[in-house]
Amino acid sequence: MPENVASRSGAPTAGPGSRGKSAYQDRDKPAQIRFSNISAAKAVADAIRTSLGPKGMDKMIQDGKGDVTITNDGATILKQMQVLHPAARMLVELSKAQDIEAGDGTTSVVIIAGSLLDSCTKLLQKGIHPTIISESFQKALEKGLEILTDMSRPVQLSDRETLLNSATTSLNSKVVSQYSSLLSPMSVNAVMKVIDPATATSVDLRDIKIVKKLGGTIDDCELVEGLVLTQKVANSGITRVEKAKIGLIQFCLSAPKTDMDNQIVVSDYAQMDRVLREERAYILNLVKQIKKTGCNVLLIQKSILRDALSDLALHFLNKMKIMVVKDVEREDIEFICKTIGTKPVAHIDQFTADMLGSAELAEEVSLNGSGKLFKITGCTSPGKTVTIVVRGSNKLVIEEAERSIHDALCVIRCLVKKRALIAGGGAPEIELALRLTEYSRTLSGMESYCVRAFADAMEVIPSTLAENAGLNPISTVTELRNRHAQGEKTTGINVRKGGISNILEEMVVQPLLVSVSALTLATETVRSILKIDDVVNTR
């Protein structure tokens, strides 16, 4: 009878035909995969940890072609990093998601995820099941979002000073921070001009075009209500047109050619003369039709097949006093149409007066010896668009200035989406750590332990801020904890003064959406990494 019991229990019997060994399962493998994923993702977080905050370091990135980028924007650093491990790539995607959702906090979100993964390692080593950790983290996240919302204060879009402070806080950690007094108002004005503050719930940043022009300094950056193109005016005599009627064509003003490659053999000079006369008559007819509509400024889309504007056509346009700008990029067409109210024309037969846009002034502006820009201002079209011209002494400065302005615009977009502000300087994270620790005491068993670990992980932001600013992280975080325990919710690290103070009084503020988005996305990513127990390579 005992033999029967043994065979029924499902234990493999050690007979010659036994299949017990074929069902071998490596119990350690899921744990090894998990720790491998966590350590790879933590390595990415540690790589950009030093670039957090106003005193954070910048990274110099060199690509395969030898092009160099200098930045401390988390999303840009990670995007250009060569990350091979799939779990580490999840953190790169996380940073990208934060960039799309909020536009700021791209470094913080990766650091928070790295810290949460560190907590997971300790919990897993204590034998807690990944599912329990994952569910507890979700509970902690829900409570954390409540805490952040309680801490926030509402903001009105009419409160210009608050918007400026938010944009300035975003710019303070950038290379161009000393120009924040110029770039912050520019960003606020740009957003306010493209939305209706009373009804807007979001901002389409495609309505704000950033044009980069080498030369000058960042002080020369300007906001233009209208259109700015880096292309030069093709005709030398006409550089200014008032009461402009602007046409945009997508066909070429040159002699027609067949699609096939062919050659024409002309046997005598009379035929040659006839060919030239035909070409001249054809182009003159095109130019006359353009002039007939009342058009006095012509924009021509770039053509890759043949010359968009022949010398003969330019000669006729010059005689008829029509200003010409050629080689307009295809991706700029939509913005141009929205700005000046024109419509793109693909064939001369459709070129009529109602296709033209109008503006007070179209002119070519000289930039103190560093090239020229073409500007159209005083547009009568209803399309709400603006252009920001970014200047700088070299390519690296211009590109970093563009990224910084983009971040500032995104911060103001966050305030339009969710009209609430929260203190910066590590204050929300310390408050989260404190309140979640209290919350963990109301829970029981493993959940309480995991929520406590989640709370401790939040302290990484103030600790890193202090470290990067040259302060002692341990004493700084301890003092912050004490101040928050006494009810000083808005106390944070004042990096500029090198100490702890009421951050709201210092006007170091950020949109609530940035913090909420960072916490949510980081927790979701960590939960995803925790749930992975195997990596399978496919052919």
UniProtKB/Swiss-Prot annotation:
PTM note: The N-terminus is blocked.
UniProt binding sites for Mg(2+): D104
Reaction catalyzed: ATP + H2O = ADP + phosphate + H(+)
GO biological process, one term: protein stabilization
Modified residues (Omega-N-methylarginine): R19
Domain of life: Eukaryota
Pfam family, one: Cpn60_TCP1
Chief place of localization: cytoplasm
Keyword terms: Acetylation, ATP-binding, Cell projection, Chaperone, Cilium, Cytoplasm, Cytoskeleton, Hydrolase, Magnesium, Metal-binding, Methylation, Nucleotide-binding, Phosphoprotein
Residue positions, PTM Phosphoserine: S36, S184, S202, S444
GO cellular component: cell body; centrosome; chaperonin-containing T-complex; cilium; melanosome; microtubule; nucleoplasm; zona pellucida receptor complex
InterPro entries reported in the protein's UniProt record: Chap_CCT_delta (IPR012717), Chaperone_TCP-1 (IPR017998), Chaperonin_TCP-1_CS (IPR002194), Cpn60/GroEL/TCP-1 (IPR002423), GroEL-like_apical_dom_sf (IPR027409), GROEL-like_equatorial_sf (IPR027413), TCP-1-like_intermed_sf (IPR027410), TCP-1_chaperonin (IPR053374)
EC number: 3.6.1.-
Signal peptide: none
Positions of modified residues (N6-acetyllysine): K21, K288, K302, K319, K326
Family under the similarity heading: Belongs to the TCP-1 chaperonin family.
This protein's name: T-complex protein 1 subunit delta
Organism whose genome encodes this protein: Mus musculus (Mouse)
